[in-house]
């Protein structure tokens, strides 16, 4: 799907179910719920197989279990190929999730270590050609 705005922030409360290996968005006062904050920006969007698709850049403020998958599904824009959080989604499509960048401070030198790549996987083929 495509978000309603070109960029935004989702703030939800997530609760993990370890037995089912799933998390869900719940009301703030739910016991065991943890705050989850996700920023997004639409990099590209197009029609594919009769459906609107968007390529998003995500920045997490928090690192919750399946956070991106849960928050996007809860917002009505589940990831392409995510059968766990969008059971009615397309079958046979790879999960449209790729960590394209990682940065952290080296524990000994203090130097910022930064790693980047293009999105990988068949879910990104139509988008990567344009990047």
Where are these regions (language model features)?
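RNA pseudouridine synthases
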Residues: 1-131
């Amino acid at each position: 799907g495509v978000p309603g705005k070109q960029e935004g922030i989702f703030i939800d409360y997530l609760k993990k179910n370890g037995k089912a290996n799933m998390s869900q968005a719940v009301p703030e006062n739910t016991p065991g719920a943890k705050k989850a904050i996700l920023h997004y920006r639409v990099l590209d969007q197009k029609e594919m197989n009769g459906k609107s698709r968007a390529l998003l850049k995500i920045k997490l403020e928090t690192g919750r279990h399946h956070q991106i998958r849960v928050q996007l599904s809860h917002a009505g824009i589940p990831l392409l190929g995510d059968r766990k959080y969008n059971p009615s989604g397309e079958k046979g499509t790879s999960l449209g999730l790729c960590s394209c960048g990682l940065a952290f401070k080296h524990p000994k030198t203090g130097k910022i270590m930064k790693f980047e790549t293009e999105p990988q996987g068949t879910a990104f083929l139509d988008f990567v050609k344009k990047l």
